[in-house]
């Protein structure tokens, strides 16, 4: 894990459908620091993560990663609301795809399958999984390859208590190794975040 992991937003603004979600938002995260993003539905939590991930355009401002020689998308793992799994593929086939695509290591996926209790299900089509099992499968990509920046949108949704603990431990370990994390979550997590950002619903014009 690069010890130079960092992420900064400089006076960024987001506009969706002609509505300003947030404006002049700034933060700076150094190695080992996490940012917890909270706020009501519609305040822009998902939009913020998608902007950082390069999936939505900035209305104003700029985003910077720690290593300017590497494109920002190559520095992060993004787990959004949609699990991003192929229903027709087995759990193992989904995981193998992430390892190949991310040029990662299958040993990390093996560990994730064990910790999330997915080993006995690995040969089943992902479409047969429950909502919680699909979420656990989606989160295994965090273990498929080392990326210094984690962007997680409601990562604990549909998870049971034991799996939330696994997630908590994974985020804490990532930060302890010098990584950076931006997490939007309604569910309380035990991870100690260095910073918290509370977004508010902007009044309609």
Question: Where are the predicted features?
Answer:
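Hydrophobic anchor residue at the start of the ABC signature
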Residues: 139, 178
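Q-loop/switch helix immediately C-terminal to the Walker
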Residues: 82, 87-103
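Conserved ABC transporter NBD signature motif
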Residues: 57-74
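Catalytic Walker B motif of ABC-type/P-loop ATPase nucleotide-binding domains
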Residues: 150-154
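Conserved ABC ATPase "signature" region
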Residues: 107-122, 140
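Helix-to-loop junction immediately C-terminal to a conserved catalytic motif
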Residues: 53
């Amino acid at each position: 894990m690069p010890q130079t992991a960092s992420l900064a937003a400089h006076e960024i603004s987001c506009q969706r459908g002609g509505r300003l979600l947030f404006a002049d938002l700034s933060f700076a995260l150094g190695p080992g620091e996490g940012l917890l993003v909270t706020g009501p539905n519609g305040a822009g939590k998902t939009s913020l993560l998608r902007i950082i991930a390069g999936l939505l355009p900035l209305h104003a401002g700029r985003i910077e990663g720690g290593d300017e020689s590497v494109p920002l998308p190559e520095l992060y793992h993004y787990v959004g609301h949609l699990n991003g799994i192929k229903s027709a593929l087995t759990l193992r086939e989904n995981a193998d795809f992430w390892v190949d695509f991310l040029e990662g290591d299958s040993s990390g996926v093996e560990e994730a399958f064990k910790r999330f209790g997915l080993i006995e299900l690995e040969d089943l089509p992902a479409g047969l999984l429950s909502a919680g099992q699909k979420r656990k499968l989606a989160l295994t990509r965090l273990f498929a390859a080392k990326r210094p920046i984690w962007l997680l949108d409601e990562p604990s949704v549909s998870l049971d208590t034991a799996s939330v603990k696994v997630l908590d431990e994974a985020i804490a370990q990532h930060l302890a190794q010098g990584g950076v994390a931006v997490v939007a979550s309604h569910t309380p997590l035990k991870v100690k975040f260095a910073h918290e950002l509370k977004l508010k619903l902007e009044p309609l014009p």
